[in-house]
Design a protein with these regions (language model features):
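C-terminal and inter-domain tail/linker signature
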Residues: 1-140
Length: 140
């Protein structure tokens, strides 16, 4: 599966091209809003989402039949943005399931600003490696 092309069609809200990536019985979970979609529901939710979108794929990790992506998504006017971490489970090079975690970008809460905590690249790598290990059943 070409995950770069998949994200391109997600952002372009191209229903016909998106459908080609999925197994017939695939499903998608949006955990932050407790939503569970079959393929048709997911494509409808994505393609009918208001606005015009763009973004960039910031990171991709692969392990067996699993692909993990971190993407930055925003409207074309860049008035706000989101980050999404997606776990793709594949079967015969098609998407069997996606588990996604969407979060709106913003400022740190006031109580934490004085801590001046920044997410370093090393910490981001460690977090993604731990997530990949958990998904692959590897003990760290």
């Amino acid at each position: 599966m070409d995950v770069i092309e998949f994200w391109r069609y997600v952002l372009e809200q191209d229903a016909d091209r998106l459908r080609e990536f999925f197994c017939e019985d695939a499903y998608v979970n949006w955990h932050c809003t407790n939503e569970h979609f079959n393929v048709n529901e997911y494509i409808r939710a994505n393609c009918e989402y208001p606005g015009e979108w763009t973004g960039e794929l910031e990171r991709t990790e692969k392990a067996g039949d699993m692909i993990i992506t971190a993407a930055h998504v925003y409207p074309k006017d860049k008035s706000w943005s989101l980050h999404v971490t997606s776990f793709f489970k594949l079967e015969d090079s098609k998407i069997k399931s996606i588990d996604e975690y969407w979060a709106e970008d913003g400022e740190a809460p006031e109580w934490r600003k004085s801590l001046k905590v920044k997410l370093s690249n090393n910490l981001l790598v460690a977090v993604l490696q731990a997530m990949l290990a958990v998904c692959s059943g590897i003990k760290m």
